[in-house]
């Protein structure tokens, strides 16, 4: 876990974000953020987005509509402060007070084969999203010793 925490620290530093939570993909980062926020209103997404985004909305039973608009680098899931920044790799590029989701898929600038991260602004967001990444478990203690209260 030491390597993961160091990776999170370096990604947060690169983007100048207070915190970064490592995930297994940008899609799962977005899903965790949607579960965390549980928006009730219809979410607006660009018509030309990656197919996993509307599939995630369907999976979570969240209403969404497509908007035919151009975007570059990143876009907001309108109605939330969640940002799909899967193709955005910019030093100092964190948008304050957002949950900014990154991708490290094999065709991205930082190509790790697979992976993602959530940039966030508070310790509370970091702590909860980190636990959600591990199915409600903390990463610093054996699961048998934990009182799991959060669902990932």
Please name every model-derived segment.
Residues 27, 50-51, 123-126:
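Alpha-helix N-cap/helix-start and coil->helix boundary motif
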Residues 35-92:
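PLP-dependent aminotransferase-like
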């Amino acid at each position: 876990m030491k390597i993961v925490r160091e990776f999170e620290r370096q990604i947060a530093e690169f983007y100048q974000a207070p915190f970064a939570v490592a995930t297994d993909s940008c899609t799962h980062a977005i899903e965790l953020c949607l579960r965390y926020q549980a928006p009730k209103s219809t979410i607006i997404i660009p018509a030309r987005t990656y197919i996993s985004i509307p599939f995630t909305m369907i999976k979570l039973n969240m209403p969404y509509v497509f908007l035919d608009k151009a975007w570059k680098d990143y876009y907001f899931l309108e109605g939330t402060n969640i940002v799909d920044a899967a193709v955005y790799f910019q030093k100092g590029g964190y948008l304050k007070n957002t949950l900014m989701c990154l991708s490290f898929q094999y065709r991205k600038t930082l190509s790790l084969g697979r992976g993602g991260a959530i940039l966030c602004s508070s310790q509370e967001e970091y702590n909860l999203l980190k636990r959600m990444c591990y199915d409600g478990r903390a990463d610093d203690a054996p699961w048998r010793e934990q009182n799991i209260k959060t669902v990932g």
